[in-house]
Amino acid sequence: RGRFALVQLPERFAESMQLALKYGLQPKRLQWVHSKIDKPAWIFLMEMQKGGSYGLDVLPPLIMYNQDGSYTEQVKKFYEPAVK
């Protein structure tokens, strides 16, 4: 089964869900991304599966920056080597 990853603005969330279902894509994972913990989400990440079963896993929000402007530990992990 094919998978599709989407990065989109929050104001397009409802439209994205409608189109996914219209074309047989079942949302599987969703994560909201915030620049800082006290700021609203500026994008969302969604993984969909063609013809997949029902069930959406809503992941904890991804916070990009600490209050001092440095990357959060969560984001730093993306830049660590995969093999040590």
What does each model-identified segment do?
Residues 1-34, 39-41, 45-46:
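Conserved Class I SAM-dependent methyltransferase catalytic core
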Residues 41-84:
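SAM/dcSAM-binding transferase cores
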